[in-house]
């Protein structure tokens, strides 16, 4: 179920930077986020702590814990803007390729860890 999450930095960014066509929403001009693409359902913006040049996040505007929780219509909108964002990143960065990564759950973050194994960045 979608819900804004006050502790989620992505919900804060999405809430501060509403799509221009959404009514009754005001943009927070103090938010330093650089928006790459924006629709009523999804937003793409440069990461504030980038791992690489032009590290861009493409997210649904509503909060979902897991990709499996995202409704099909919302996932389709995220997928619709993704190719344009990838083209823009490649053009601006001069890169010949890109990665699209989607992490789900605590174990998806490096290093992953559970009772059976431990994986560090060095092992990858």
Residue ranges and their predicted role:
Residues 1-124:
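HIT superfamily nucleotide-processing domains
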